Amino acid sequence: MKKVSVFGSTGFIGKTTVGILSGNTEDFKVIALVAGSNVSLLAQQAKLLNAEMAVIADDAQYEELKRSLHGSGIRVAAGKEAVLEAAALSVDTAVMAITGIVALSAVMRLIESGVGTIALASKESVVCGGVLLRDAACKSGTRIVPVDSEHNAVFRLLSQGDNPYKITITASGGPFLHWSHDQLKSVTIEDALVHPVWKMGKKISVDSATMMNKALEVLEASYLFELGYRKIDVVIHPESIVHALAFYQDGTSTALMSLPDMSIPILHALYWPHRKEVSVREVDLIAYGKLTFIRPDFERFPALKAAFDILQSSERDVASIVFNAANEVAVESFLNSEITFLEIVNIVLHVMNKVPYGKVSSLADIMEYDLLGRCIAREVISDAS
């Protein structure tokens, strides 16, 4: 029986994970559940899974969580330090589904605690943690198994032991793939939150619409799998059936295909290195009839071009951190109706040109550049308003 903790249990990935764990109680013992502010759902999940500990990151929710779990025997804690305390608990697998760079400190604490496997759904922590995170995981023996569909597919393809010369990850193209530039000028928040294939949270839905999500995934793949600029490619694949492809020197290639269902990579990461047999729908190629692949237009998706530019830059580490930080601020501003949809990526690119670059050698350096990127992004937004 594996000991498991889930960070970000009340988000979409977290809720899907909890559903899998609740249906396989004979295989998992839940040690800790960590959520941001949804205290009622966290309490329900903790009771359902009989977790040993429930942590709410929002200090103000502590008393409510304590009342909700009174008499359950479940330990309760709140605040940022409590999140790190949960990350230090001894588990076999930790699911990291917290969005944004705030996940990075917890990921590093998990690695320091010697966790066997991190099922990682926080691409931002890899983009910002970069080589520092990868080297720490290698030193401690922690295996990072990515949970997002494309990187989980790459992980599986590379696990076959072959040495591909190139990896291609796919992108759905988002909700505005065929919209004109004039139409994009009038995109509403509601428009951006409706994804044609995947069911996701607000931030990642907006990132998918701007193609920033795929841009971050390009950087994530570079760090996770040590892939250089020429070894990563992206194609738009609206059906989201093929998640990644590996190309070999003998002229052959291998693709990993599945229905667009996040429970598949989550299940794989939870049971890794074993494969869990479950009743799932297989891909019916006859029903689909055809699969579509489109080369992305860098003029239409400047965020994606920026990611490949970063891969070629000698300032990759700092640039990745600032790229993510500025985007988090810009997306938040868009969701607060402070900027337009088209301004999101423009602001990010503007911030990239204003940051003084240097070296990253510690977690403190990462947080410093993250803060700098956020401050400049807020200044740019303020000056434009």
UniProtKB/Swiss-Prot annotation:
Mn(2+) binds at residues 148, 150, 217. This is 1-deoxy-D-xylulose 5-phosphate reductoisomerase. It catalyses: 2-C-methyl-D-erythritol 4-phosphate + NADP(+) = 1-deoxy-D-xylulose 5-phosphate + NADPH + H(+). NCBIfam families: Dxr (TIGR00243). NADPH binds at residues 10-11, 13, 36, 38, 124, 201. Pathway: Isoprenoid biosynthesis; isopentenyl diphosphate biosynthesis via DXP pathway; isopentenyl diphosphate from 1-deoxy-D-xylulose 5-phosphate: step 1/6. 1-deoxy-D-xylulose 5-phosphate binds at residues 123, 149-150, 172, 195, 208, 213-214, 217. The keyword Manganese applies. Its EC number is 1.1.1.267. It is an enzyme of class 1 (oxidoreductase). Transmembrane segments: none annotated. Belongs to the DXR family. The keyword Chloroplast does not apply. GO terms for molecular function: 1-deoxy-D-xylulose-5-phosphate reductoisomerase activity; manganese ion binding; NADPH binding. One of its GO terms (biological process) is isopentenyl diphosphate biosynthetic process, methylerythritol 4-phosphate pathway involved in terpenoid biosynthetic process. Its cofactor is Mg(2+); Mn(2+). Keywords: Isoprene biosynthesis, Manganese, Metal-binding, NADP, Oxidoreductase. Catalyzes the NADPH-dependent rearrangement and reduction of 1-deoxy-D-xylulose-5-phosphate (DXP) to 2-C-methyl-D-erythritol 4-phosphate (MEP). The gene is dxr.
